[in-house]
């Protein structure tokens, strides 16, 4: 079991690294279909933020919730959410968006709620 947790920890930190890479790359390198990007709604752009932060929060809390320092993970993800949006101000082809921050926070809260409910359910069994 410890090996699985260790592997999940590596996956968690790799996912953060991957997210950071996506945010620092110019938009032209990421978006292959430029016409689809132009016609994208705010919801279509921000939903990816919701999914990714739900995933990151769920994975991080699942791995670290048994440890007493899980609040550090919560704080790290909150800072990461704000930091990656601020980076958009300086990366060519990227834009700062309050909707993306909202989607990050909602994804973060959803992941937190999901893991909290799963942990309560597991404790009952």
Predicted regions and their residues:
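Bulky hydrophobic segments
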Residues: 1-101, 105-125
């Amino acid at each position: 079991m410890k090996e699985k947790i260790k592997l999940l920890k590596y996956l968690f930190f790799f996912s953060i690294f991957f997210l950071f890479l996506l945010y620092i790359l110019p938009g032209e390198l990421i978006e292959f279909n430029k016409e689809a990007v132009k016609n994208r709604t705010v919801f279509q752009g921000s939903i990816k933020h919701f999914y990714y932060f739900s995933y990151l929060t769920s994975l991080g809390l699942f791995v670290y919730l048994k440890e007493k320092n899980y609040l550090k993970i919560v704080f790290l993800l909150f800072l990461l959410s704000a930091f990656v949006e601020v980076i958009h101000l300086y990366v060519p082809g990227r834009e700062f968006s309050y909707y993306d921050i909202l989607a990050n926070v909602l994804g973060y809260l959803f992941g937190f709620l999901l893991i909290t409910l799963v942990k309560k359910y597991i404790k009952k069994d």
